[in-house]
């Protein structure tokens, strides 16, 4: 805070600040910061001030300007040079300590503690300062006039603020100045004018100034204008000594206002561009403001000690004021912080209360919602349980009903099956043999009577039967016994008696041979005991085509054992012969219903001719030996119905059946041939054995067996027919067998590795299974670029037989009927060989006739092609299944007629 002696206001004597040493003529410009500086004194304190100085200031509002406001109103351009050179090695402080006061330029004093928020509207309002000190006597009226004069010189649009000098005076102490501590609450102050030569902003520089709100800018740079308050030049002649002393005291207080910034002042004084007038002088009258300059006043001498004491006093007072302001500021901050904290706490409490209410409400809603959901879920579960109970009860009822219906259906099915079986087997039922009367054993002492069953024999009471001779011998020995030897020692020296087995050795031959009827009794004395028959055995394999074997097998081997089951007993079995290949499937017989038109012819025939209807003993059909459960139930039902129908037809014809009794004849031994009856000999002579001369067997060649030779011979004859043939395997096999039966096949040119087998093998017709196996192993049914789908023999097979040049398609002359079109080209014209164009005589069966075997398997329609026809050997799978369902009727020429002249019979296939 800057203070001024009170004498300055009373006598209106101005103090010439240029005579004061230590303050160079400098001008500082401080950049305006974007934030507003804090006001150290609250506004309430200024408003509550009731001192007379405040009253005077209230009357003159133009004088109520703080030092910061005054400093901010003094602007200068940045281009003005502010530095001052040293003269004679002396600085501005050296001139301050001189005894003689010399006139110096205006000094810039920066008060950083004041509020610099107020910015003057124009820097030219204070450009002039009158040197005349007599105008200081002018009071508030002069200051008002000065402000009116300065208002006319504004460069900006707004009215400039009043410039005041914070110099106050207390009436009670004329020599003791006192500070107020607040720049905004100052007393009545003089308002000097700036000299014309010390203008801070010339007229030509007004274009660079701009204002935005309360801020002043120079070329977009915010500035704070600081003005020297000690730059006035009062006259020493009109200024009393007391005023000078007070002025010096005021100067010391001014220096104390910024003790911390001494270094800044000294450093910044060299950077000042232009001096600025200070408001420390008296007011000049209006008539001296025309740019006139007054002469300088003589300087006054000031004691050095007096200045030093005043400086220390001002520093202490300034320090106290700052401490007081700091405390007040801290208190104010604490109150504000406390108020904010209370407001924040109150707000948080309200927020917590609202949050708590909201949370309670939400929890309550959630509980109500959960309760409703629980009740709803319970109701849903109850409904679900009730529905499930109803469904379960309904399901149980339906299950019970279904079980009852199933049981009823099974009972009806069993009854029906039993009835059908009884209907079929009632003709084969054996007469019931009368059961032997039960034999009851008599009383056996302690045992109760019991039944003696068929295979039981009552044991005798005494097994050892003693003869009378043995009894007499025992009596003699008892009489002749001596005392020297005891009976016990004699018993020990003898051997015990031995007896035969206690079990019954003999079997009841009558039970075993009850079905055997001996036509004529013959003597069998001297004949050894026959070997007992073993149990019946079933030998059936799934991969074989021949029927299963059902009979006895009494041969025993010493080589094949459980520990070596894969051993080969070549003495007992022939491993080179495959019985499955030798099996010949018989042609299906004619249906029994075909003889309906011949009933009249068969009436007079003997009934014994029907004996051939029965299957020979030991023969089983293909499906025999398999349990009924494995068969198809639908086919089984149809089969049973057809059999019952056929039996009804046979019974309607009047045919009678009787159970055949086996006849047991022989053996007739050579020694007893004379005693044998003629009927037995006549019967046995039909089966007389013929002895044949067997040629010595050829030594087997190493590397090839008889079966392989036979296959090679058949394959050599089959290749011309097979290679390039478009027909199925059934047609090829049938044609080849027919050629073999007629003896039309001849062996091609002999190869070095192939020799002619035995005559029997060459004449025999190969079986269908063997031919099919040879076809599948040595050829493939496929399509090649050179021709369409047909059979192609493997090249290595053709090369081994030397027949690589066989044509495709084959040029075979058929002797059997051919299908109308190939299998893969049903719409194209059939390619027939030379022998296929011969007309055949066909004999059709009646339309109403049906084979009994067609119901055993699923029927395949004519022309149906399987899915595997286009892929190798699977092309004729349907033909294999049709083997058992086809029957063929052939017209056989009369015996004795020439076969070559008679027309070839045409077989008729019936499905």
From Swiss-Prot:
Positions of the UniProt region annotated as Binds PCNA: 1-31
Residue numbers carrying Phosphothreonine: 838
Sequence ranges of Low complexity compositional bias: 265-281
GO molecular function, a single term: identical protein binding
Region (Binds to p60): 639-911
Composition skew (Basic and acidic residues), residue ranges: 310-408
Pfam families from the UniProt entry: CAF1-p150_C2, CAF1-p150_N, CAF1A_acidic, CAF1A_dimeriz
Effect noted on mutating residue 224 to S/D: Prevents binding to CBX1 and CBX5
GO BP term, example: nucleosome assembly
Region (Necessary for homodimerization and competence for chromatin assembly): 621-657
Region: Disordered, residue numbers: 166-200, 250-408, 578-618, 819-843, 866-886
Annotated Gene Ontology cellular component terms: CAF-1 complex; chromatin; nucleus
Quaternary data: Homodimer. Part of the CAF-1 complex that contains RBBP4, CHAF1B and CHAF1A. CHAF1A binds directly to CHAF1B. Only minor amounts of RBBP4 are complexed with CHAF1A and CHAF1B in G1 phase. Interacts with PCNA; the interaction is direct. Interacts (via the PxVxL motif) with CBX5; the interaction is direct. Interacts with MBD1. Interacts with histones H3.1, H3.2 and H3.1t.
Protein name, per record: Chromatin assembly factor 1 subunit A
Organism: Mus musculus (Mouse)
């Amino acid at each position: 805070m800057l203070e001024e002696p009170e004498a300055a206001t009373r006598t209106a004597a101005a103090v010439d600040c240029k005579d004061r040493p230590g303050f160079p003529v400098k001008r500082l410009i401080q950049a305006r910061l974007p934030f507003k500086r804090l006001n150290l004194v609250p506004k309430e304190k200024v408003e509550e001030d009731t001192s007379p100085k405040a009253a005077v200031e209230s009357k003159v509002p133009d004088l109520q300007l703080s030092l910061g406001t005054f400093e901010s109103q003094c602007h200068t351009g940045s281009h003005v040079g502010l530095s001052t050179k040293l003269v004679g090695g002396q600085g501005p402080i050296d001139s301050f300590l001189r005894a003689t006061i010399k006139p110096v330029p205006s000094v810039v004093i920066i008060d950083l503690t004041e509020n610099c928020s107020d910015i003057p509207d124009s820097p030219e309002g204070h450009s002039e300062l009158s040197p005349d000190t007599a105008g200081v006597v002018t009071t508030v009226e002069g200051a008002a006039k000065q402000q009116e004069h300065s208002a006319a010189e504004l460069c900006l649009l707004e009215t400039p603020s009043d410039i005041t000098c914070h110099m106050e005076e207390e009436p009670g102490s004329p020599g003791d100045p006192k500070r107020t501590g607040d720049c905004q609450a100052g007393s009545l102050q003089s308002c000097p004018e700036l000299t014309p030569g010390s203008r801070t902003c010339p007229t030509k520089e007004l274009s660079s100034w701009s204002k935005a709100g309360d801020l002043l800018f120079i070329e977009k740079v915010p500035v704070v204008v600081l003005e020297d308050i000690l730059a006035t030049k009062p006259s020493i002649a009109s200024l009393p000594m007391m005023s000078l002393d007070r002025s010096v005291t005021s100067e010391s207080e001014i220096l104390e206002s910024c003790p911390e910034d001494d270094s800044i002042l000294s450093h910044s004084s060299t950077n000042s561009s232009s001096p600025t007038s200070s408001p420390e002088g008296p007011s000049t009258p209006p008539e001296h403001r025309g740019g006139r300059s007054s002469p300088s006043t003589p300087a006054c001498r000031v004691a050095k000690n007096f200045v030093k004491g005043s400086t220390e006093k001002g520093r202490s007072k300034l320090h106290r004021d700052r401490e007081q302001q700091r405390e007040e500021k801290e208190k104010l901050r604490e109150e504000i912080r406390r108020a904010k904290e209370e407001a924040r706490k109150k707000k948080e409490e309200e927020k917590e209360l609202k949050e708590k209410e909201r949370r309670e409400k939400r929890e309550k809603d959630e509980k109500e919602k959960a309760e409703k959901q629980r009740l709803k879920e319970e109701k849903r579960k109850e409904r679900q349980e009730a529905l499930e109970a109803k469904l379960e009860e309904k399901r149980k009822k339906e299950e019970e009903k279904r079980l009852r219906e199933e049981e009823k259906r099974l009972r009806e099915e069993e009854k029906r099956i039993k009835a059908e079986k009884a209907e079929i087997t009632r003709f084969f039922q054996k007469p019931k043999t009368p059961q032997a009367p039960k034999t009851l054993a008599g009383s056996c002492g302690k045992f109760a009577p019991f039944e003696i069953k068929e295979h039981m024999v009552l044991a005798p009471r005494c097994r050892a039967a003693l003869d009378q001779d043995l009894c007499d011998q025992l009596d003699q020995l008892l009489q002749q016994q001596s005392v020297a030897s005891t009976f016990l020692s004699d018993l020990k020296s003898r051997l015990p008696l031995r007896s035969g087995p206690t079990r019954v050795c003999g079997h009841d031959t009558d039970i075993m041979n009850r079905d055997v009827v001996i036509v004529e009794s013959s003597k069998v004395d001297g004949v050894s005991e026959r070997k007992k028959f073993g149990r019946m055995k079933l030998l059936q394999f799934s991969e074989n085509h021949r029927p299963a074997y059902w009979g006895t097998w009494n041969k025993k081997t010493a080589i094949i054992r459980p520990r070596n089951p894969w051993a080969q007993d070549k003495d007992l079995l022939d491993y080179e012969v495959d019985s499955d290949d030798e099996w010949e499937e018989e042609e299906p017989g004619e249906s029994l219903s075909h003889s309906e038109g011949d009933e009249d012819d068969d009436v007079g025939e003997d009934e014994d001719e029907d004996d051939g209807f029965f299957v020979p003993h030991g023969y089983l059909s293909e499906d025999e030996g398999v349990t009924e459960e494995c068969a198809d139930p639908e086919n089984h039902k149809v089969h049973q119905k057809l059999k019952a129908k056929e039996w009804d037809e046979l019974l309607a014809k009047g045919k009678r059946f009787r159970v055949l009794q086996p006849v047991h004849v022989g053996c007739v031994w050579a020694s007893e041939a004379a005693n044998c009856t003629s009927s037995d000999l006549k019967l046995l002579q039909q089966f007389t054995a013929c002895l044949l001369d067997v040629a010595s067997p050829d030594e087997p060649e190493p590397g090839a067996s008889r079966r392989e030779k036979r296959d090679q011979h058949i394959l050599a004859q089959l290749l011309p027919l097979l290679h390039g043939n478009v027909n199925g395997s059934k047609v090829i096999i049938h044609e080849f067998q027919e050629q073999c039966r007629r003896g039309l096949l001849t062996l091609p040119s002999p190869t070095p590795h192939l020799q002619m087998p035995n005559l029997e093998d060459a004449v025999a017709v190969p079986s269908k299974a063997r031919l099919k196996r040879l076809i599948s192993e040595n050829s493939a049914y496929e399509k090649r670029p050179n021709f369409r789908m047909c059979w192609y023999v493997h090249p290595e097979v053709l090369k081994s037989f030397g027949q690589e040049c066989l044509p495709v398609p084959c040029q075979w002359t058929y002797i059997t009927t051919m299908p109308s079109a190939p299998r893969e080209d049903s719409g194209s014209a059939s390619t027939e060989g030379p022998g296929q164009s011969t007309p055949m005589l066909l004999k059709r069966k009646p339309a109403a006739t049906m084979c009994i075997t067609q119901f055993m398997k699923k029927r395949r329609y004519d022309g149906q092609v399987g899915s595997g026809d286009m892929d190798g050997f699977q092309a004729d799978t349907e033909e294999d299944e049709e083997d058992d369902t086809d029957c063929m009727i052939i017209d056989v020429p009369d015996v004795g007629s020439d076969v070559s002249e008679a027309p070839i019979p045409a077989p008729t296939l019936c499905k």
